[in-house]
C-alpha cells in the first residue's frame, strides 16, 4: 500500500470519527433537551398558587415549614356567648393581675377561659377538670388557641398547671377522631422523673375516654416499652430512649398530629437539640400541631420554635424578661460556715418537721450525689424517715422514693438537682437548700417546688462564702419578690456577672458594625 493510500485511509477514519462524535453530541443534546422539558413540566405541576404568586414546593422535608392546614387545625373552637358578653375591663383586669402577655400574630384575640363553665368538652373530661376551682392562667389563655388547632409557645414557671394546659386539648382532639390508629399525641420531656409525672397526669384523662397512654424512658428494659408503643395513642418520652427506639424501627411517628416539647429550655441545656430535631423530622409537618412549654425564652429556644412551628401564639405568664421567684414563697437566706451546714440542717428540721408540723412535706436539696448519700445516712442515723432521689440510685429506687413522698409514707425527701425542675409534688410546705445550686436560675426552680397551685410555702437557704459570686443574682431575686435581704449576704457584693457570650466569654461586648474605623495618623 502506497503512502498516499495510507494517508487517504487515515483521513476516512478521522472523518468517520468526527461524524460519529457529532451524532453522539446531537444525541446527548436531544436527550438533555428532553430531560429539561420533562423537568420543566414536572416542576409546573409541583407549583402551588398562593394569591397571585406561584410558590415552588420545597424539596427537603427538613427545611419545610409546617403548613397551617393540619389535621387538628380543622377543629374550630367556638367562644361561648357568656364569655363574649363579659366586659372587656374584666379581661384586662385578669391579664394585669396574672401578668399575662399574648403575642398573637394571627390576630385571633381569643378570650381567656376565666371559668370551666365557658368550656364545652366531653362530659368525662369536663368532670375531671372541674374538680379544680378554676383554670390556671396558662390553661385559661392557651386552651382556646389549642382547641382551635394553633401552635402555641407557653412561657411559664413550673407548677403553673401546664400538663393539663396541653393535655386537655390533646385528649379532646383524639376524641374527635377516634378512627385513627397509631401514635397521635407525643410529649417529649427532658427527664425520666418529669416524663413519669406527665404520664401520671395524662393517664387520668386517657383512662376516662378509653385511650391508651404509655411512658418511655431510659434505665429500664425496652421489651415492655415496645409492646406498649404498639397499642398507645398517647406517648410521653425522653429524647434519648425515643431516638433509640426510632433507630431500631420499633416506633412509628408518622401519625403524630399533636407534638409537645415540655421544658424545652432544659432539654436544650442538656444537649438534646439534635435528638429533638431528628425526632420531629419523623413526624408529618403538614398535619402536626406543635406546642412548646418553657420556663425561659433564650435564643436557642426561639430558633427551635421558628424552625418547627407555624405562626405560634406565644403566651407568657409572669415577668419573663427577668428571673423572678413566686411571690407566695417566703424566702429565708442564712449565711453560714460551710462546715456547720449539716448540723444546721438538723436544727431546721426541728423547726419545720416536728411537733404540729411533723406531717408537713419538706424537700431538701443537696448539690451532688455524694453529698446527698452522706446526708441521707446522717438523717437516718438521727431517726428521720427520709426518701431520696439522686444519681447513685437505680430508676426503680428513685421512683419508689418519689411515690413514698407523694403518698405521705415519708414526708421528708432529699434530692439533687435531677428533681429541681418539673416534678409536681403536691403540698410541699418547705424547701431547704442545704447547698446552694450552681446558678441562681436553678435556685428559683428549686424553691418553685413549694407555693404551687395558689398555696403558700417557705424556702430556707443556707448560703456560704463559697457561693459569693452568686450573691448579686440572689439579692436581685429576693428584692424582686419583696423578700428581706440579710446584711451578711450584701457583704459579698451585689454586682452580677455579665452573661457570657458563647464564643467570646465574658469579654464579649456588642459593637456597632455600622461605624467606620477611625483613621489614625502618626506625626
From Swiss-Prot:
- EC primary class: hydrolase
Q: Where in the cell is it found?
A: Nucleus, Nucleolus
Segments of skewed composition (Basic residues): 22-48
Q: What is its EC number?
A: 3.6.4.13
Give the Helicase C-terminal domain ranges. Answer: 344-493
Record InterPro entries = DEAD/DEAH_box_helicase_dom, Helicase_ATP-bd, Helicase_C-like, P-loop_NTPase, RNA-helicase_DEAD-box_CS
Bias (Basic and acidic residues): 1-21, 49-67
Helicase ATP-binding domain: from which residue to which, for each copy? 143-315
- Please tell me one Gene Ontology term that the record gives under cellular component: nucleolus
Q: Which UniProt keywords apply?
A: ATP-binding, Helicase, Hydrolase, Nucleotide-binding, Nucleus, Ribosome biogenesis, RNA-binding, rRNA processing
User: Where is it chiefly localized?
Assistant: nucleus
| Positions with a binding annotation for ATP | 156-163
Q: Catalyzes what?
A: ATP + H2O = ADP + phosphate + H(+)
A single MF term (Gene Ontology)? RNA helicase activity
Motif: Q motif; annotated at: 114-140
Q: Which Gene3D superfamilies match?
A: P-loop containing nucleotide triphosphate hydrolases
**What SUPFAM superfamilies would the database entry show?**
P-loop containing nucleoside triphosphate hydrolases (SSF52540)
Keyword RNA-binding applies: yes
Q: Where is the motif DEAD box annotated in this sequence?
A: 262-265
Q: Would I find Ligase among this entry's keywords?
A: no
Stretches for region Disordered: 1-71
Protein purpose: ATP-dependent RNA helicase required for 60S ribosomal subunit synthesis. Involved in efficient pre-rRNA processing, predominantly at site A3, which is necessary for the normal formation of 25S and 5.8S rRNAs.
Which protein family is it in?
Answer: Belongs to the DEAD box helicase family. DDX5/DBP2 subfamily.
Mind telling me which PANTHER family this protein's record contains?
ATP-DEPENDENT RNA HELICASE DBP3 (PTHR47958)
Please tell me what else the database record remarks about this protein.
Present with 38900 molecules/cell in log phase SD medium.
Q: What is this protein called?
A: ATP-dependent RNA helicase DBP3
Q: Which organism is it from?
A: Saccharomyces cerevisiae (strain ATCC 204508 / S288c)
**Gene for this chain:** DBP3
Amino acid at each position: 500500500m502506497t503512502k498516499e493510500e495510507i494517508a487517504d485511509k487515515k483521513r476516512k477514519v478521522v472523518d468517520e470519527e468526527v461524524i460519529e462524535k457529532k451524532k453522539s453530541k446531537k444525541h446527548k443534546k436531544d436527550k438533555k433537551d428532553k430531560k429539561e422539558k420533562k423537568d420543566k413540566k414536572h416542576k409546573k405541576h409541583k407549583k402551588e398558587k398562593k394569591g397571585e404568586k406561584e410558590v415552588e414546593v420545597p424539596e427537603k422535608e427538613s427545611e419545610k415549614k409546617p403548613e397551617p392546614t393540619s389535621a387538628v387545625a380543622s377543629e374550630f373552637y367556638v367562644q361561648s356567648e357568656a364569655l363574649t358578653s363579659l366586659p372587656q375591663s374584666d379581661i384586662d383586669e385578669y391579664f394585669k393581675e396574672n401578668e399575662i402577655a399574648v403575642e398573637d400574630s394571627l390576630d385571633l384575640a381569643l378570650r381567656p377561659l376565666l371559668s370551666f363553665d365557658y368550656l364545652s368538652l366531653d362530659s368525662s373530661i369536663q368532670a375531671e377538670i372541674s374538680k379544680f376551682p378554676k383554670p390556671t392562667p396558662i390553661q385559661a389563655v392557651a386552651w382556646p388557641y389549642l382547641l382551635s388547632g394553633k401552635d402555641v409557645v407557653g412561657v411559664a414557671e413550673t407548677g403553673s398547671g401546664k400538663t393539663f394546659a396541653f393535655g386537655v386539648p390533646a385528649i379532646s382532639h383524639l376524641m374527635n377522631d377516634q378512627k385513627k390508629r397509631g401514635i397521635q399525641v407525643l410529649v417529649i420531656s427532658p427527664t425520666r422523673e418529669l416524663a413519669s409525672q406527665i404520664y401520671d397526669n395524662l393517664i387520668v384523662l386517657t383512662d376516662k375516654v378509653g385511650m391508651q397512654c404509655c411512658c418511655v424512658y431510659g434505665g429500664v428494659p425496652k421489651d415492655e416499652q415496645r409492646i406498649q408503643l404498639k397499642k398507645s395513642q398517647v406517648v410521653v418520652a425522653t429524647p434519648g430512649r425515643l431516638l433509640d427506639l426510632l433507630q431500631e424501627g420499633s416506633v412509628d411517628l408518622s401519625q403524630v398530629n399533636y407534638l409537645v416539647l415540655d421544658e424545652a429550655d432544659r432539654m436544650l441545656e442538656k444537649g438534646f437539640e439534635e435528638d429533638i430535631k431528628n425526632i420531629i423530622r419523623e413526624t408529618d409537618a403538614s398535619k402536626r400541631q406543635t406546642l412548646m412549654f418553657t420556663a425561659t425564652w433564650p435564643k436557642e429556644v426561639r430558633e427551635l420554635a421558628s424552625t418547627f412551628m407555624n405562626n405560634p401564639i406565644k403566651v407568657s405568664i409572669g415577668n419573663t424578661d427577668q428571673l423572678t421567684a413566686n411571690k407566695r414563697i417566703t424566702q429565708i437566706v442564712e449565711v453560714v460556715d460551710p462546715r456547720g451546714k449539716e448540723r444546721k440542717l438538723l436544727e431546721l428540721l426541728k423547726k419545720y418537721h416536728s411537733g404540729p408540723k411533723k406531717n408537713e412535706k419538706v424537700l431538701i436539696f443537696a448539690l451532688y450525689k455524694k453529698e446527698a448519700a452522706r446526708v441521707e445516712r446522717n438523717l437516718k442515723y438521727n431517726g428521720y424517715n427520709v426518701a431520696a432521689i439522686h444519681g447513685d440510685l437505680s430508676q426503680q429506687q428513685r421512683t419508689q422514693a418519689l411515690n413514698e413522698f407523694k403518698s405521705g409514707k415519708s414526708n421528708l425527701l432529699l434530692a439533687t438537682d435531677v428533681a429541681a425542675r418539673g416534678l409536681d409534688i403536691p403540698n410541699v410546705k418547705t424547701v431547704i437548700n442545704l447547698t446552694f445550686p450552681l446558678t441562681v436560675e436553678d435556685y428559683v426552680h428549686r424553691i418553685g417546688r413549694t407555693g404551687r397551685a395558689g398555696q403558700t410555702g417557705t424556702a430556707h437557704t443556707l448560703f456560704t462564702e463559697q457561693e459569693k459570686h452568686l450573691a448579686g443574682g440572689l439579692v436581685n431575686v429576693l428584692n424582686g419578690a419583696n423578700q428581706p435581704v440579710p446584711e451578711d449576704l450584701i457583704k459579698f457584693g451585689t454586682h452580677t456577672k455579665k452573661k457570657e457570650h458563647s464564643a467570646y466569654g465574658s469579654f464579649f461586648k456588642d459593637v456597632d458594625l455600622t461605624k467606620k474605623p477611625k483613621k489614625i495618623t502618626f506625626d
